[in-house]
Amino acid sequence: MPEICRFYGIILYLYWRDHNPPHIHFTYGEYVCNIRIIDRVVDGKAPAKVIALVNKWIDAHEAELLSLWEKA
């Protein structure tokens, strides 16, 4: 699973050939979550501040993430 970014202890991953809908995986300490790129639905648990930071990162990189998803 390729790591696509790391910040504030949050590690973001994008699996190749993963199931739809487009999403990324992230870890923060013992927390493991998936978050959809388009509608930001979260699967898993993490502190609200961490989810907010991941959402801001996705906002800044949404087009690039969707392009990577299509190529994967």
Protein language model features and the residues they cover:
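Short acidic-hydrophobic surface loop/beta-edge motif
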Residues: 3-7, 26
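C-terminal structural segments of small proteins and small subunits
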Residues: 47-72
